Amino acid sequence: MAQNNVYLILFLCLMFLSYSQGQVAEEDFPLAEKDLPSAKINCPEGANAYGSYCYYLIEDRLTWGEADLFCQNMNAGHLVSILSQAESNFVASLVKESGTTASNVWTGLHDPKSNRRWHWSSGSLFLFKSWATGAPSTANRGYCVSLTSNTAYKKWKDENCEAQYSFVCKFRA
């Protein structure tokens, strides 16, 4: 058994050496990375792709709970979870480019037990934070989170969950 492993290692070393010296052509490796088909993300009309998800801005104004339920009924999604600065920039751009006049747009971030422990409605881990100055508020506590137009939709503010805002749904492509 050990002898077979030695032969395998020797073979792999020789192949690597030959390849690195240009003696083995790329055509000898039919499944080279450049030949693999790229994954095309198909989102429904009106939705935009980012990563492996589709994002859909809904301009109708609903409460946070109604908005999340709407997203769940739409392709088994949730209100948008924003997990990185890059995703935050994408969502902000999506909202701005829509031409919406909404001053606030719901995200999926909420505090379901009103104890200042924030959770994404999708179940994603809450690691990335982008709170607006003074948020979350200690004086005017809200338990649902929106993006605000006065921060170009890049910063978060805690709001009353019964307020009615436009929202962004996020679902797997």
Swiss-Prot record:
Disulfide bonds join C43-C54, C71-C169, C144-C161. GO terms for molecular function: carbohydrate binding. It is found in: Secreted. Keywords: Disulfide bond, Lectin, Secreted, Signal. It comes from the Eukaryota. GO terms for cellular component: collagen-containing extracellular matrix; extracellular region. Expressed only in regenerating islets and normal exocrine pancreas, but not in normal pancreatic islets. Expressed strongly in pancreas, weakly in liver, but not at all in gall bladder. Might act as an inhibitor of spontaneous calcium carbonate precipitation. Residues 41-171 form the C-type lectin domain. GO terms for biological process: myelination; suckling behavior. Residues 1-22 form the signal peptide. InterPro entries: C-type_lectin-like (IPR001304), C-type_lectin-like/link_sf (IPR016186), C-type_lectin/snaclec_domain (IPR050111), C-type_lectin_CS (IPR018378), CTDL_fold (IPR016187). This is Lithostathine-2. Transmembrane segments: none annotated. Pfam families: Lectin_C (PF00059).
